[in-house]
């Protein structure tokens, strides 16, 4: 059936455009004109090939994939520029100003006071930023990201404000001289920068939900380690181990791409040798002869580093718990009392011994390269001035021992402060001192050996202690890339594996301790009392649901009470058979749809005759004449037939689900609308598809009776058109009342924008809790619906499950 020639307003992205419809236009072609191409579901091309929607989705997928790689390249490039700039500020501004500040006087006592004042002032400023401006910038940032990547999205952790204040806070805290690092904040900054870029228009489409956004942020975390140590491969592995529980292989390539782009950017920016911040870590060892004595020494070093790592974590936990129970003690002094006390103590202990007040990069360089003949030998042999008879290696043994003890305690205390901090670099320096300590002992035991190099032991110790504390084997790859030397590859791997194994036997990693202390949700921490716990024991029985046959008032009241993104749909209140789930956004659109119908029914209805241009004044006069003379008994049969057909077109325009594409809808959530012109005239919309009769025939929830009556009376020449229009409006008013029953399943069949997920995650009441936890971790869902023979009996929410566990422990 073809439509007669008439003008129609077609919904488009920029409003309504006038389209002339020819006489031979079929209803199916007219439907394709009215409906947006991307929203036509199930319509095949004339050649019987792939549907138009499938083609558009294929193009969208290719474009989306291109934007993903473009986004990763942008993060790698911009992140490398940003982080290198921060490093240069540390080198040429913060540390230079500190030396200049201390050189204002040659008096030792005044220099001592200047060093204390500098440390206290910068640490207090960093604490002020955290407490008063941006609390989300506190700490390492890795535990928060770990919680996000496990499925608990927290937008405040990666907000754009965090990017700025985390950087400023880190400049103050790290520049103060506290025993902290910067790799954790660098990873956090990389993720925050990535999330900020995702808010830019070209990249909005690639992060359509929290899960996809989290995957992209996880891929960008490798940039932080690549910028800190110049280690793209180790950075990727570390980001996987430190922030992930289960990892997608597709994200593996993205992380490598981001880290590679970042590494290239860093190499270009630091091409000037004077700006190469990593050159001091390069080593050049002679070939290693792994004899039995040295092999045993490396094994002992790995075990020792594992024990020290566990001791460090236990010390941190005890200090944190003590501060938590005595928080009022510090508040009585000053809001920043704990920071002032720790900063002052750090400065007092560090200044007297030169090697203790070195920044961590210089300390590591000294441990890796200092020999009796090197230029920096006096740094670690400073204790030898106590006696002229003390050999170099005896002095350095004592220096390393003091460095390990003091730095281990200061680091454990410093990471309990409310400031931005990292943990990897100070552990790196402490581990190098432990390795150097063992190497110097080996040299004392075997003074005639020409194959023992204490500096090589320092490299192994640095990797082993970091691996034991963070439980990351990637520490081995980071140290090998950092030193650019594979001579000690086997001892490094051996030490890291032994250290991680010893640590796992004794306690959790330092990042897991951060997670627990901050009470962050994290599924792997969930521990059931016994394997006998099943879904019935932990499910929530107080249910919110919507019945298949419901009313607008019931939907409105339900939306006011629930916070979930989706609501289960059941057959009825009696049997509670689970049909599926529907999003709260869709329910809001259902209400908005009926409100639109209500508003249109109240507006004056005017009808355009077939073949009349609605923007033509003459044609508008004809329309008005038709309306004003509807009751004229002298009208000919053609006019009566035309007017009666117009009435049916009004009903059909309201009945059919014509989607309007609004410019104000940023999310492109298409809500049904009836096209009208500027004079509130409903435009004719005879768009029944003969090949898809169900689309129009099933659309009878609101004015089906009126529609049929108009069709039956279509050839009646004596119909009063004004009365028909009024009857249409009255029927619409009745159909959209708040107590009118709405069949959601029927609406889904009739409207492509109403989507009911007919296969939500369902579990039986007898499923063990350990399996439920595993499902949450692997599938990434938020809610599991508990059913018994299809009947909805409860829900298990991931967030509530974790919060219950945190409250118990």
Swiss-Prot record:
It is a multi-pass membrane protein. This is Chloride channel protein F. Residues 1-65 are cytoplasmic. Residues 604-646, 692-729 are annotated as: Disordered. Keywords: CBS domain, Chloride, Chloride channel, Ion channel, Ion transport, Membrane, Repeat, Transmembrane, Transmembrane helix, Transport, Voltage-gated channel. GO terms for biological process: chloride transport. One of its GO terms (cellular component) is chloride channel complex. It is found in: Membrane. Residues 620-646 have a biased composition (Low complexity). Belongs to the chloride channel (TC 2.A.49) family. It comes from Dictyostelium discoideum. Pfam families: CBS (PF00571), Voltage_CLC (PF00654). Residues 539-597, 756-809 form the CBS domain. One of its GO terms (molecular function) is voltage-gated chloride channel activity. Voltage-gated chloride channel. Chloride channels may have several functions including the regulation of cell volume, membrane potential stabilization and signal transduction. The chain crosses the membrane at residues 66-86, 110-130, 152-172, 218-238, 246-266, 295-315, 333-353, 395-415, 425-445, 459-479, 486-506.
